[in-house]
Structure formats: C-alpha cells, structure tokens
C-alpha cells in the first residue's frame, strides 16, 4: 500500500489489521459508502507490443479494451486452468491489470517469459496507485465493466445492486475523492465489506489455494464476457474452446449462504446431504458476517436443477443457493 495513502487512512480513523484489512467504525448500512481496497493490486503492462502479448495469454479480447471499456478475464496454464482472474483497463498507452495481491508476482513472472524480443514493460504499481470502491443503492445505470478516465483516475463499473464502481487513482486523487465523497454523505466502509460485495456480485477472484484449479467457464467468466471464442490462440485456449463447443460445462459457479459463523477455507469440500462422501464441488471463496456465511462455490451442475448440499466438514448445515447477478 502506498505510504501516503496509508497515512491518510489512519488520519481518517482507520484501523489497519495485521492481515491488511482496513476497518472503520460502524456506519448505517443504507448510506452510500467509499471503501479502501486492500487485497487487490495493479500491474501495469506497457510498450508497443503490450496488447499483442496480453492477447496471446488471456481469455478475453484485449483489443476490445479501451479507455471506455474494461474487461474481466483470466490467464490460464496449458491445461486451461485459470491461474488468476483480473480486471483489465486502459489508461493512455498502458494496460492496467487489477488482480489479487498474492497472485501479482506469479502472474508477472509468467508473463515475462513470453516477452522475448517484444517491446513490453511490466511494473508492479501497488505502491504507487490506490484502489477504492464506491457503492450506493441505485440500480446500475451503466453496462458491466464500462470504464471512464476522469481527472487521471480510472473508473470501472461493476454493476449489480448496490451499484458499484472500482477506482484506480494516485494518492492525492484518492485523498481528494475520499474527502469529496464524505462531504456528499458517503461513509467509510471496511475493506472486507468490499470483498463481500465482490463475492455477492459473482466476481470470481482467485488466491494461491484456488489458482490453477478451474477452467474459466467453471468461474462463469463466459457469462461475464471474460472469454472470447473468436479471438484466436492463447495459452490454454484449446481446453477452454473444447469445453465450450462440447456443450454446457459440467461445473459452474454458484452463490450460496449458510448459517455458519466461521468461513470455510478455499477448496473446502461440498457434498450431497444424503449422497455419502462423494464431492459435488468446493468452495472458491467465503466470508462470514453476523453468523451467516456467504460463499462462491464451483459445483457439479444438477440435470434436475435440484440441490441439497452441505459442507463436508459441517454436515448439519444446509447450503442455500442464491441467484447470481449474472448467470
């Protein structure tokens, strides 16, 4: 985190936990909120061959990314398993990859292997740029991943209800935006609350435990516009395309909740209530709040459309499936 931004948040009465989470005093839930984002980072990719390199490694069509249109996507290994998911935006001559902090260095190292003689430069800008989230109650008025460049900041619409925008800004811009929004009646929100909103919005962020576990369709990236089936070759493309052209994926991403005060770990097994020990899927990410656990899970798709599922380690706790904002 940028030191200037960190000191500003501390001056705004933030508490920064040892695990990086940023916490403020409680505020009314019906207020619009502004959130510091602590679990994501920014990798800049620039140079005249940047688009070509990214196009050959990502599931989305990089040539569709402009200063007014961002994209979600994934980098895959040769077996078609997603190494990391990302949001990709464009600012001037550089592409900005927003992805989990813990996967930035592995992604950067892997992409650098493909540079060879190309004019491509990578820069971890996590200590230069700040990530913020804006959330308010109105229904989305912009298309998902619509982008804007305003006063040097990049804004990406995340749709859903509440309507949300992710902001990439330099420290002074972030401070000014924070002060301005608080003056408009916004309340400071906890970084973990933003993570929960991402989860409820069906944004399939990966971590070290879930990296290289799932093909992109299992993460609903096709439904989020994060897979192009016409762009041509990229690493893992054959497996991703085969999954698409053979028909419906056998597994998909589901949103669920259960009465559990402690969130299960990533990859925790999920099974049928009366189906023995055979796994029906696993947890992708989970957050517990006030005795309710919200989770994204990759599950076998039921032909009947009926599910009676429990966590393997909590067989008495039923999972209730909820509709994803985009499914």
Q: What are the residue ranges of the model-derived segments?
A:
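Acidic, proline/glycine-enriched N-terminal capping motif
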Residues: 1-72, 76-77, 81-83
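Glycine-rich, small/acidic residue-mixed loop/short-helix segments
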Residues: 2-9, 219-227, 241-327
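Short amphipathic beta-strand starts and helix->beta connectors
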Residues: 24-30, 71-85, 115-116, 146-155, ...
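Acidic, low-complexity central loop/insert segments
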Residues: 33-36, 41-42, 87-201
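A common structural junction motif
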Residues: 61-62, 112-120, 181-191, 274-278, ...
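Short, conserved active-site entrance elements at the starts or edges of catalytic domains
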Residues: 191, 197-222
């Amino acid at each position: 985190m940028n030191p200037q931004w960190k000191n500003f948040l501390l001056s705004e009465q933030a508490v920064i936990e040892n695990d990086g989470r940023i916490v403020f005093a409680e505020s009314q839930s019906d207020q619009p909120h502004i959130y510091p984002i602590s679990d994501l980072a920014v990798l800049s990719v620039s140079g005249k061959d940047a688009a070509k390199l990214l196009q050959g490694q990502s599931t989305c069509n990089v040539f569709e990314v402009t200063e007014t249109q961002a994209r979600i996507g994934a980098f895959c290994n040769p077996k078609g398993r997603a190494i990391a998911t990302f949001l990709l935006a464009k600012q001037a001559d550089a592409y900005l990859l927003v992805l989990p902090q813990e996967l930035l260095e592995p992604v950067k190292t892997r992409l650098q292997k493909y540079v060879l003689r190309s004019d491509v430069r990578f820069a971890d800008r996590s200590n230069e740029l700040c990530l913020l989230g804006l959330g308010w109650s109105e229904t989305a008025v912009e298309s998902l991943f619509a982008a804007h460049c305003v006063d040097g900041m990049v804004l990406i619409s995340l749709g859903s209800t509440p309507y949300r925008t992710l902001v990439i800004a330099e420290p002074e811009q972030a401070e000014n935006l924070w002060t301005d929004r608080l003056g408009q009646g916004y309340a400071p929100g906890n970084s973990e609350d933003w993570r929960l909103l991402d989860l409820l919005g069906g944004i399939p962020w990966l971590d070290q435990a879930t990296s290289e576990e799932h093909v992109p369709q299992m993460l609903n990236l096709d439904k989020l516009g994060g897979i192009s089936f016409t762009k041509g070759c990229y690493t893992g493309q054959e497996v991703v395309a085969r999954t698409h052209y053979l028909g419906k994926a056998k597994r998909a991403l589901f949103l669920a909740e259960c009465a559990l005060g402690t969130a299960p770990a990533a990859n925790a097994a999920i099974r049928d209530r009366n189906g023995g020990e055979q796994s029906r899927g696993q947890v992708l990410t989970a957050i517990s709040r006030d005795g309710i656990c919200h989770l994204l899970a990759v599950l076998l798709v039921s032909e009947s459309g009926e599910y009676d599922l429990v966590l393997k380690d909590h067989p008495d706790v039923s999972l209730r499936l909820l509709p994803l904002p985009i499914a």
